[in-house]
Amino acid sequence: MKAREVNFDGLVGLTHHYAGLSFGNEASTKHRFQVSNPKLAAKQGLQKMKALADAGFVQAVIPPQERPNVDVLRQLGFSGSDEQVVEKAGTQAPHLLSAASSASSMWVANAATVAPSADTLDGKVHLTVANLNNKFHRATEAVTTERVLRAIFKDDARFSVHEALPQVAMFGDEGAANHNRLGGDYGDPSTQLFIYGRDDSGHVAPSRYPARQTLAASQAVARLNQVNPGQVVFAQQNPQVIDQGVFHNDVIAVSNRQVLFCHEQAFAQQEKLLATLAERVPGFMPIQVPTRAVSVQDAVQTYLFNSQLLSREDGSMLLVLPQESQNHQGVWRYLSELVKGDNPISELKVFDLRESMANGGGPACLRLRVVLTQDEIRAVNPAVLMNDALFNTLNDWVDRYYRDRLTQADLVDPQLLREGREALDALTKILHLGSVYPFQR
């Protein structure tokens, strides 16, 4: 059945700030305590969504989460009114207020893992929410993520949204950032590639930075999503690249249909994996970038692989990149040669996403890929689908509510809490989501 890939992009939240919360993510650490611009961050994301929608790709939006997360601060022993809870946390434990105020839900590649209906035993689209339990500031996202996804994918006859795995290290799950799908047309049954960093049965693991995804989690997600067992491949990410700052697989590899674009050091036992995929995927085309052309360090700094690989109607592909890739002479030289070569990637499109990039999130981090048939697209909440009217409405909404300057010290401002709630209350009406936030319930 004919299907299309829909990119659901995360809208950057009002508390976007730089606090270095994500150990293992070198951009996050490098930009700690710098001044952020939430308004610019949100607009940069919206501009990417609008440009891709204008280019003919189906584009949708996922809203930010309520921050500061007052409920989690109460769980940690701060009491009083909501404003007092924020003030006490900011005074006594600013690092906890910062974590509870993180806008990290913008990176919706970590929101869930998706299985299109062509791959599932029951013929439904399945989405399993990620628990993100390796990082405190992200482990609190799952409950609201589940509510939001249920408000977008409401038709139970077509969609199944599963709650996150148990919040323990054994089942550490980072969502679609560690998942790729390889096949022919989007509507064809395809091979799902689940990538993990850690297997508790004793395989080699990274030593400097944590491996956030476990094999046990990937196996559980494949079961929950009812992926046909004959269409699943599990592969370990190279632990050496995790130790160089490749905290998710989407920092070192991206796939689209029959193409896997990756670094030659991306996976453990890479030759064996590619041979397996060649057996499973008709017309499989790996594009491996050699270290001599682009080092792992340069890939991490430029987010060359944290790109979007999108199919045009004629079968050619567009590679959507952050500006940092264009700014790096060696990386841009490689890419300029790539589009001249004998492969489907025929065009490069560059976006300025520096506000997100400074916290370690590029184009691929900002989007959740969901392959849908036309009937399934019609069953999605239509208010989240990007068009001229929604873009203008959201742009005006950002202008009305967002600050253009934010530091960690500003998070204690009770007005920021009120601004955020007022903004999100308006947003749920724009996107027809109902009461998905704690303050609305």
Swiss-Prot record:
Identify which residues the record assigns to the active site. Answer: E174, H248, C365 (nucleophile)
Gene Ontology terms: biological process: arginine catabolic process to glutamate; arginine catabolic process to succinate
What's one Pfam family here? AstB
Which domain of life, per UniProt? Bacteria
List its EC numbers: 3.5.3.23
Q: Which GO molecular function, any one, fits this protein according to its record?
A: N-succinylarginine dihydrolase activity
Matching entries from NCBIfam families are given as: arg_catab_astB (TIGR03241), PRK13281.1 (NF009789)
Q: What is this protein called?
A: N-succinylarginine dihydrolase
Species per Swiss-Prot/TrEMBL record: Enterobacter sp. (strain 638)
